[in-house]
Amino acid sequence: MKRDRLGRFLSPGSSRQCGASDGGGGVSRTRGRPSLSGGPRVDGATARRAWGPVGSCGDAGEDGADEAGAGRALAMGHCRLCHGKFSSRSLRSISERAPGASMERPSAEERVLVRDFQRLLGVAVRQDPTLSPFVCKSCHAQFYQCHSLLKSFLQRVNASPAGRRKPCAKVGAQPPTGAEEGACLVDLITSSPQCLHGLVGWVHGHAASCGALPHLQRTLSSEYCGVIQVVWGCDQGHDYTMDTSSSCKAFLLDSALAVKWPWDKETAPRLPQHRGWNPGDAPQTSQGRGTGTPVGAETKTLPSTDVAQPPSDSDAVGPRSGFPPQPSLPLCRAPGQLGEKQLPSSTSDDRVKDEFSDLSEGDVLSEDENDKKQNAQSSDESFEPYPERKVSGKKSESKEAKKSEEPRIRKKPGPKPGWKKKLRCEREELPTIYKCPYQGCTAVYRGADGMKKHIKEHHEEVRERPCPHPGCNKVFMIDRYLQRHVKLIHTEVRNYICDECGQTFKQRKHLLVHQMRHSGAKPLQCEVCGFQCRQRASLKYHMTKHKAETELDFACDQCGRRFEKAHNLNVHMSMVHPLTQTQDKALPLEAEPPPGPPSPSVTTEGQAVKPEPT
């Protein structure tokens, strides 16, 4: 006997007859062992995994033509899910029964990967000849493991432990059929505020355009992953599928959207146009979360309604079911028309549910919100219904906390506030005195800058600076004194203006004294009699009146007024008694006393006479 590349026995006429390849494949599964019936047995699974039709000898798979000849089977293939390359022994067909299913008695409830994949994920598997019709053993086992787990979870998540169905007491009892299972699960149908809100919204939108009264038409069975759906509609053909388990379907939608299914634009023109609208036609367009009516699902139709039945398996896996899921709520449609009103999108379903539940559970939610506000900063992993709002609140709280902590932790660089006062106190306690180093100069300064300026002006740059204006014979030894003289005497620049009367002044101190007249302020006051004045010169002149006459050595011989200094007496005589002073100068020289020793009471050069003390 000859063997092929995989070690399978070939019949003597396999190289010439095309039909013998299947038989040889069947023998290879037994590896030459005789069957129980005594003859060669053809393996059903191997026949179903044939790489082409029975009558086509030269049909090659995706990997190319057969190298060994036209009669040999293709050795390699790709997995539809993981896209890996495997041998024919490691591949399973996507349209065969699940492992462990009975081959002699194929029941109606047997699992097929194409149908189960659409029921679990809501995405139909396209029967495209360009795509591989096989999956590997690993992907096949993982899929059905997840399928059984998710199906059990969906059936238990909204059911109480008391409402579960009791297991069959008899060992040989048959499991309930799909109709009986749907009837048992009718009691487990639960409704949420979101579900009722969507139904009420559809009823109101439907009443605006249609006069027929909607009513319950049928209940879809729980074969579709345990999700029970109720179809409402009117006699005009408008229908609405109420999803009683949106949370579970949202989980399925998220897992389905994780794989980015490309939109096939070529299949859009191939959609049938003559068929009426039915929620079972296209699972992706009839449901709000992209999980449509299962293929072959059993329905319970009320006797007063006339609704089209869901399509067969061949229709479900056709081009119509190849579109990606659409994340939108059910639409109100009529035959040949678009939806009249679209309900809120799935992104706002959770918010609508929360707002709707707040109306009935206000007290409980208020306590929960208070607890959340108190423990907002305790855990970052706690669930919040509005994560986008909570993130912004956490950011603002963290910024405020940082701002409050910054002045306590951070220290500004440089000296601390109040360092100038400390220096002043130290200077007052131990004053530094700078004395002029030049001999005969008694100038004293508290700062080094003042001493340097004094030495420069009075000792180093000492020279005569005459006034440049003609007719002015004044001479200054310091330059800044000369500039001040020129500004005040020889120029008419008045930069200081009174705001009250508009009078102008050359110096700022003159303006300040003038403004005291408008305000009436007299900051200077005599300590003896309380006399008030504005200028220091006025106060000094006033204080001379309070001195005793004995302290004033110089007296006027005309009016008897006394002065402290001889210069003040001369000024008084020249301004008050000018005639008497000129008459004294006009006396003839012969009137002068004869030469002799000068008396102590007479002075030369017209000096004032100082009387002797009596």
Curated annotation (Swiss-Prot):
Annotated region described as Disordered, given as residue ranges: 1-50, 268-420, 583-614
Listed PROSITE patterns: ZAD, ZINC_FINGER_C2H2_1, ZINC_FINGER_C2H2_2
Ranges of Basic residues composition bias in the record: 409-420
Top-rank lineage group of the source organism: Eukaryota
Binding-site positions, Zn(2+): C79, C82, C136, C139
Key words, A-Z: Centromere, Chromosome, DNA-binding, Kinetochore, Metal-binding, Nucleus, Repeat, Transcription, Transcription regulation, Zinc, Zinc-finger
Biased composition (Acidic residues): 357-369
InterPro entries: Znf_AD, Znf_C2H2_sf, Znf_C2H2_type
Subcellular location: Nucleus; Chromosome, Centromere, Kinetochore
Chain intervals with Basic and acidic residues compositional bias: 386-408
Chief localization: nucleus
Database matches in Pfam families: zf-AD, zf-C2H2
GO function term, MF aspect, one: chromatin insulator sequence binding
Segments of skewed composition (Pro residues): 591-600
Domain ZAD: 77-163
Alphabetical list of Gene3D superfamilies matching this protein: Classic Zinc Finger
UniProt key word Zinc: yes
GO BP, one annotated term: regulation of transcription by RNA polymerase II
Zinc finger residue extent: C2H2-type: 434-458, 465-490, 496-518, 524-546, 554-577
KW Zinc-finger (keyword) present: yes
GO cellular component annotations of the record: chromosome; kinetochore; nucleus
Function: May be involved in transcriptional regulation.
Official protein name in the record: Zinc finger protein 276
Organism this protein belongs to: Homo sapiens
UniProt gene name: ZNF276
